[in-house]
Regions:
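Active-site loop/turn elements of alpha/beta-hydrolase fold enzymes
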Residues: 36, 62, 114-115, 185, ...
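Short glycine-enriched loops at secondary-structure junctions
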Residues: 7-11, 61-68, 115-117
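Short hydrophobic interaction/assembly module
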Residues: 51-75
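Histidine-acidic metal/acid-base catalytic patches
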Residues: 1-25, 40, 45, 51-56, ...
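A short beta-strand-loop structural module common to alpha/beta enzyme folds
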Residues: 30-39
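Active-site acidic/histidine proton-transfer and metal-coordination neighborhood
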Residues: 80-210
């Protein structure tokens, strides 16, 4: 089953019903994910469309709606991994609100970002080196290895904070019959890494959570030599509940329409469970025609 995320058009609409009708009318999607750029002002129109039976929702991407003090899409504005307990508490309460909206709109999933380790950024510097023709140069490898050592040394306390927050969020989601998708992240600094995620799922030990695979993020990590995309997906596929579908132009230009970049969808998609939810997450810069062509190719290869 395929759905479409409002991250493509929420920024250019002031009315939620018009935003949803653009996706339905121009792209033909009946099933929609409310992305992390949904302002509170869009909610009345969204609720109106839902109440009229004109739209169904696959999922909500935390935080949805945006906290009132945040003006633009910002899924990492509050983090479960934060040093200060006040920020962690704010992240939890905002996530509860997202879960409440998901329950109200009969959306079965909420997609979560979990936070990051406080360390010198490494992902973007590696991307810049790759773009400058220095991929896997001595400088590149030295920077990468140093970052891995620091991440492994310092990450545990941040991951523990995430676990403490997640337990509360899982309990709340269970009370609302909403499932949580823990998304793989673009940046090596972010939580969880692919090494951390299986044990995180094991420790939480809840049917309420599963893995949410972002094709673009995983491809960026493969392009930067952090993982093998197919090997990772093959290992985690049985625990995957949904995914964000997008392509990626080397090394890190993601949110492209499928079949426009270097993601080997023909090899990767069949690895996923038959009941996996596929949510298209497109850049606002992609045109309707580009997306339509991609949808047609997808349906020819993988069906509806």
């Amino acid at each position: 089953m395929i759905a479409f995320s409002t991250c493509w058009n929420s920024g250019r609409h002031n009315a939620g019903d018009k935003m949803l009708r653009e996706i339905k009318g121009k792209l033909g999607f009946e099933l929609i994910e409310l992305g992390h750029g949904i302002r509170i002002s869009l909610m009345p129109g969204i609720q109106k469309m839902f109440d009229a039976g004109e739209v169904r929702f696959s999922s909500l991407h935390n935080f949805c709606p945006l906290p009132v003090e945040v003006m633009a899409a910002s899924p990492d504005c509050y983090q479960f991994s934060a040093v200060y307990p006040q920020e962690r508490e704010r992240a939890i309460k905002q996530t509860f609100q997202t879960i409440d909206f998901a329950a109200r709109l009969s959306a079965p999933f909420v997609v979560l970002h979990l936070g990051a380790v406080n360390m010198k950024p490494i992902t973007d510097p590696l991307i810049e080196l790759a773009k400058a023709g220095k991929y896997l140069s001595r400088k590149y490898v030295r920077l990468k290895l140093s970052a891995v050592q620091k991440r492994e040394k310092n990450g545990a306390i941040y991951v523990q904070r995430v676990k403490d927050c997640l337990r509360r969020v899982i309990d709340y989601a269970a009370s609302k019959n909403v499932k949580l998708g823990l998304e793989n992240r673009r940046g090596y600094e972010e939580i969880p890494t692919e090494r951390e995620l299986p044990s995180l799922l094991d420790e939480m030990n809840s049917p309420q959570i599963g893995y949410w695979h972002d094709f673009g993020h995983a491809q960026i990590k493969e392009n930067l030599a952090f993982l093998d995309h197919a090997e990772w997906l093959r290992a985690i596929a049985p625990r995957t509940v949904g995914c964000h579908v997008q392509d990626c132009i080397w090394p890190a230009q993601d949110h492209q329409p499928p079949f426009a970049g270097g993601v080997d969808l023909e090899k990767l998609v069949p690895l996923l469970p038959s009941n996996c939810l596929f949510v298209w997450e497109m850049s606002p810069r992609k045109t309707t025609d580009e997306i339509r062509r991609s949808i047609q190719l997808w349906k020819e290869r993988f069906g509806e």
